[in-house]
Amino acid sequence: MTWILLATGVLAWAWLLVALTVAFVNHGRVRRMVETRRWLPYALFARYRFMGVLGGALAKLHVPSAVRHREIIEAHQAISLADMEQLRDIVVEMDDLPTIKKGKEALGLTTMFGMSTFPVHKRPSPFTHPMQYPPYLIPGVPARPFYEAAEFEWAQVLEREYPSIKKELNQVLSESGAGFKGYMSEANFRHQGWNTFNFFFYGKKFEENCERCPETTRILESLPRFEKDHIMFSSLNPHARIPPHVGPMNGILRGHLGLVVPPGCFIRVGPDERTWEEGKMMVFDDSFEHEVWNHSDFVRIVLFMNFWHPCFADREIPVLERFRAAYERGPLSRVHADNQAAKRAHDLEVRVPQKAQVA
């Protein structure tokens, strides 16, 4: 009995220490002191190391059979101070981009350093919204949940190419959905009923899938301002739901080309709710809180892709690409891409309405 009480006491003190550490690191005054050009690499380095151990432990507790928690810890531990210094140097470059300068002025900021020390999304401006709170909020990007497809030439190209893309999807579905995999979140949690057939994921090209859908791949790679981090056929099973979440950063628009859309499928982005239409593009900003429902008896499938926001000039895109690569294509993202590529069964229910077939 004594050892049980002793163990309980030790665990209680350990959790208290963790809580105090997190509170200290996130205290506004402390974070403003460390999130400067000089100290930011050290602050991020320490945070990643700490969150690696904590995140791995939490993942193991929640889903022990579905989580590669050891890889999460090892990926965080593989992050070096040099990686964080590189990220700092890119942020210095971003500070000088015209679009970002305009956003900083509107928000009363002089630099992007220290932006996470206060809730920027709660400051009224054309570039913020209370329901837009990604981990990286780039100032200067208009805050709009949805956009109209007619605003983008690339969206019109995809709508014209719908028959070719749908034909290749039907071929994949005729093979019992081989190539689809259960989607794993960045925390390595499985979303039941959400399956993806990946073309690109965190910069990793899925060669076999691209070869099976050559026209779809050709069309995507020919488009301007195409962003190769998340490109896939995205399916949602009957009566499944993707809970509210936000993307990692703003400045990138998400496109969905409706391929199989039974009645009863909806998406909420910020305060607004819409549904898809087969052969039509839906464009939205995934840095807003968003969630998806499929209330039907059939699978819902869209072609899912990313494009850089039109507010950025072409000469600004290379700097933004380096920033995205610095934090998304490091050790953590390699683990996430490898997990997505791993041989893992899907739970895709290939139940397609007859009207959705395209010859």
Tell where the protein language model's regions lie, with residue ranges.
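Short beta-strand His + acidic residue motifs that chelate non-heme Fe in jelly-roll/DSBH
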Residues: 242-245, 265-267, 284, 290-296
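A short hydrophobic beta-strand segment most commonly corresponding to one strand
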Residues: 254-258, 283, 298-313
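Non-heme Fe(II)/2-oxoglutarate
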Residues: 74, 81, 86-220
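Double-stranded beta-helix
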Residues: 304-353, 358-359
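Conserved metal-binding segment of the jelly-roll/cupin
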Residues: 275-289
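Short, conserved beta-strand element in jelly-roll/cupin
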Residues: 225, 235-237, 247-264
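A short beta-strand-loop-beta hairpin characteristic of the jelly-roll/cupin
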Residues: 259-278
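Fe(II)/2-oxoglutarate
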Residues: 1-145
